[in-house]
Amino acid sequence: MSFEEAKKRFQIFFTTAGDVAKGAAGAVRRKLGYVAFDSWAYYVFLINKDYLNNLLFSRLKNFRRIPLFISRTLSAALSTLFSYYFKMHFPPKPVGDFRVFGKNDAPMQEIEDLWEQNKTYYGITVDRKSRYLKWRINQNPYFDYVYVLNYKENRLVGYAIISLNHNNAFLIEDILAEKSDMSIFDEIISYLIWYAKDAGVAAVSCGTLEGNAILKSIFARNKFVDVEAFRSRITRKERSKEFHVFFSPEIKCKQ
């Protein structure tokens, strides 16, 4: 299906600016009518300081105004400082009812029911029905996802979907709590941090849009650090809006 054909069927399209291709893909998409909408945020809770050292260095070394040896030294120093910060804010081990499932064993109907009962709390977002999750998560051949489910009195009240990336960090793909309850989110995040520690995983992380108010609040409460915001402060370079949206002319919106 071509883009012109798709425009007749759908009203909104989402894509990225193509940062890997040095922005070339983003330039093409803007010519098609996409609008730069938001920047990416990358939240991290560090368990092993070497992970953050490598992460900071990988971002700073691409900034030409900072010499490579300074980027390396600065990354090492900052990761050491941050390791003390994360130790100070390491959460108590949660005592709730948590159950971990592989992607082929998760109770999909329970998850869909939780979503249907609470989707009004989450605004415009993907519809987390079991059919979508099976396609997006369970049938994804590139990642081995794990479902972490939180129960209270044998009733599902929240979940997180995570995968282990190539840098030995848990990446949160999705997280949801009944009534968007922050106390439930806090318990889930605490469990993920301890789950990572016990499994020898270096960090818990989540990549999302900077403007996602719910996730920003969740990760701020739980003392995660937005690496992209930190890099922006060090380099004094404003974050580019790499998330692009195409709106059908039928939709009235303010740009």
Report each predicted region and the residues it spans:
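Conserved glycine-rich acetyl-CoA-binding loop
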Residues: 1-4, 8-9, 178-187
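Polar/charged alpha-helical tracts
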Residues: 5-8, 58, 83, 109, ...
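Alpha-helix termination/capping residues and helix-transition junctions
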Residues: 7-9, 142, 198
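Active-site/acyl-donor-binding loops of N-acyltransferases
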Residues: 13-87, 136, 146, 152, ...
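A conserved beta-strand-loop-helix scaffold within acyl/acetyltransferase catalytic domains
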Residues: 19, 96-178
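Generic alpha-helical secondary structure signal
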Residues: 23, 109, 113, 131, ...
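Alpha-helical structural motif
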Residues: 66, 73-74, 78, 107-114, ...
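Long, low-complexity segments enriched in small/aliphatic residues
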Residues: 85-101
